[in-house]
Amino acid sequence: MIMGQYLFWLANAHEPIENRIPELPNFISVLYHRFQHTTWAQFLHRWENIIFAILVASLISLVAYLGARKKEIIPSKFQNLLEIAVEKFSHLILEVLGPEGKAYIPFLGTLFIYIFTMNIFGMVPLMKAPSSSLNITAALAICVFCLVQFLNIRNMGIFGFLYHLAGSPKSMLEWLLAPLMFSLEIISQLSRPLTLALRLFGNVLGEDILIGTFALMGVVMISSVETFVGIPLQLPFMFLGLLTSFMQALVFTLLSTVYILLSMHKEGEKN
């Protein structure tokens, strides 16, 4: 009912609808529409992506705490399912990183669960997918970038890493080309978090816009009969959204795994 009212308001607002980005309402946007002149509503509206990101993190932490507290000698079907999922995920990471990758499974597993939960959070009524904000996806990409650079410096040393960025020159010609190689490698390093952030942001935002557009169409189609209950045209796309949410979380995690692999140099490459 609230969704229909809010989308109906969007369709009949004074601002032309073609200038708006169709998006399913969340409880913060509903409160802001009702109390937009109050300070607290403006604060919530300004920081809504951060608030939803914190809500997702809190929800995951709560579920993990409750799940860990109720350990059973004979595992339930749900616990068996989770154990199988963790085992498959760990096997996937170890296939890419090798035995040394065991240390990175907690980080990569947390990254996958957090991103996937954020992606599907927008499908919950009156919630929003925080990963549809570039600020959130950029923060995640920067975390991966910082970890990769830390591993590079730890494995090769600062000067060894700079030498690697220059293309590991040995001959005179290679030293002459070192500034060019250094510039290209810097661009390559910086493009990694940029592409990670933009890919996740663009796909999740596009998914939300698609669902919001069809939800709005369902309301507008029967607006003439003066009802706030629209046709659920967005329902098929929500099932598709579950698949794309999983795939985007998996792609982000696998690319992060590859970047970690590229930073795991052999001891002989240290300077």
UniProtKB/Swiss-Prot annotation:
Signal peptide segment: none
Protein's UniProt keywords contain Transport: yes
Name of one Pfam family that matches: ATP-synt_A
Membrane-spanning parts: 47-67, 107-127, 133-153, 209-229, 235-255
Annotated GO CC locations: plasma membrane; proton-transporting ATP synthase complex
One GO biological process term: proton motive force-driven plasma membrane ATP synthesis
UniProt-listed InterPro entries: ATP_syn_F0_a_bact/chloroplast, ATP_synth_F0_asu, ATP_synth_F0_asu_AS, F0_ATP_A_sf
Membrane topology summary: Multi-pass membrane protein
Compartment annotation: Cell inner membrane
Keywords, sorted A to Z: ATP synthesis, Cell inner membrane, Cell membrane, CF(0), Hydrogen ion transport, Ion transport, Membrane, Transmembrane, Transmembrane helix, Transport
Family listed: Belongs to the ATPase A chain family.
Function field: Key component of the proton channel; it plays a direct role in the translocation of protons across the membrane.
Subunit structure: F-type ATPases have 2 components, CF(1) - the catalytic core - and CF(0) - the membrane proton channel. CF(1) has five subunits: alpha(3), beta(3), gamma(1), delta(1), epsilon(1). CF(0) has three main subunits: a(1), b(2) and c(9-12). The alpha and beta chains form an alternating ring which encloses part of the gamma chain. CF(1) is attached to CF(0) by a central stalk formed by the gamma and epsilon chains, while a peripheral stalk is formed by the delta and b chains.
Protein name per the record: ATP synthase subunit a
Gene source species: Protochlamydia amoebophila (strain UWE25)
Gene: atpB
